[in-house]
C-alpha cells in the first residue's frame, strides 16, 4: 500500500521538472548573486508552515533561517552536516527544500517519504535520508523501501498513519519542484539571506561562517561579495557542473 500511494503521488509531480544548466564563470555567478540581492528576502513569509531540521516550526521563529535545497539521490546532499549545524546553533533554522532529479523516478518518492517522516518523527526522517544517500564518486541511487520500513519501525509509526500523512505532503514537494525550476541549477544549494550558494556542501562549522558572510553582503556593511563569488565558483567547478 505504501508503494502504491507513493507511485500515485509521483505521477502528478514528475511532469513539472525543468532544471536550468549552471554557468561556472565568475561574471555569471556575480550576475546571479546581484539578481538575488536586488530582491527582498522574507523567509518567514516564504517558508510559512515549514519546519526546521529539529522539528520546530518556521512560523514565529526569531533567529536566522537558511534554505537547504537538496536531491536525495545526490551523493553530496548530506543531511548530517546541516543537522549538526542546526543542533549546534539554536538561533538557526535550516529548512529542507526539494529539487528532485528527473533522471530517476524514485527521486520524488524519496522526497515525499522524507517530508512525511518529518511530520511524524524528525529523527526517523533524518535516519532515512542518511540510509539512502548514495556514495560519493558512485552516485548510484539507493533503493528506499527497506530504509523506509526501518524508519517506520524505529519510530513505531503505523502504516496507516504514514499513508494518511503522506497524502498531505504532495503539495509541499510539488511547490518546491515548481519553485526550483527557475531558481535551482544544481544540488546541494543553500539560500542564505536570499543569496543562492550552489554546489556548496558545507560542513557544520562552515554553515554559520557562510551565513555571516551572506549577512554582511546583504547589509552592505563591507565589500565581501568577491569572497562569496570565489566560494561559489570553486564549489561549482569541483562539483562538475561546469
Question: Model features per residue range: what roles?
Answer:
Residues 21, 69, 150-242:
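C-terminal cap of thioredoxin/glutaredoxin-like
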Residues 59-61, 87-89, 106, 182-185:
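Extracellular/periplasmic catalytic domains that process cell-envelope and extracellular macromolecules
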Residues 52-55, 82, 176-178:
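A generic local structural motif
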Residues 46-65:
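A short beta-strand-turn-helix
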Residues 67, 72-153, 226-235:
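Structural alpha/beta surface segment adjacent to cysteine/selenocysteine redox centers
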Residues 1-49, 223-242:
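N-terminal targeting signals for export/organelle localization
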Residues 8, 50, 72-75, 91, ...:
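Secreted/extracellular small peptides and ectodomain modules produced from precursors
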Amino acid at each position: 500500500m505504501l508503494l502504491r500511494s507513493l507511485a500515485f503521488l509521483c505521477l502528478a509531480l514528475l511532469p513539472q521538472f525543468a532544471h536550468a544548466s549552471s554557468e561556472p564563470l565568475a561574471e555569471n555567478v556575480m550576475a546571479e548573486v546581484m539578481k538575488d540581492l536586488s530582491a527582498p528576502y522574507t523567509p518567514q513569509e516564504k517558508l510559512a508552515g515549514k519546519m526546521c531540521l529539529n522539528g520546530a516550526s518556521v512560523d514565529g521563529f526569531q533567529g536566522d533561517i537558511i534554505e537547504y535545497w537538496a536531491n536525495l539521490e545526490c551523493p553530496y546532499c548530506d543531511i548530517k552536516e546541516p543537522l549538526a549545524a542546526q543542533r549546534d546553533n539554536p538561533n538557526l533554522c535550516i529548512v529542507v527544500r526539494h529539487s528532485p532529479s528527473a533522471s530517476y523516478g524514485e527521486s520524488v518518492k524519496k522526497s515525499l517519504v522524507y517530508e512525511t517522516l518529518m511530520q511524524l518523527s524528525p529523527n526517523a526522517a533524518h535516519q532515512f535520508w542518511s540510509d539512502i544517500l548514495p556514495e560519493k564518486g558512485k552516485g548510484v541511487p539507493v533503493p528506499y523501501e527497506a530504509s523506509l520500513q526501518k524508519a517506520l519501525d524505529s519510530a513505531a509509526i503505523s502504516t496507516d498513519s504514514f499513508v494518511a500523512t503522506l497524502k498531505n505532503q504532495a503539495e509541499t514537494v510539488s511547490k518546491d519542484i515548481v519553485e526550483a525550476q527557475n531558481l535551482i541549477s544544481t544540488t546541494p544549494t543553500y539560500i542564505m539571506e536570499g543569496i543562492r550558494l550552489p554546489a556548496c556542501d558545507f560542513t557544520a562549522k562552515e554553515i554559520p561562517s557562510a551565513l555571516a558572510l551572506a549577512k554582511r553582503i546583504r547589509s552592505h556593511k563591507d565589500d565581501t561579495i568577491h569572497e562569496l563569488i570565489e566560494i561559489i565558483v570553486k564549489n561549482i567547478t569541483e562539483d562538475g557542473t561546469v
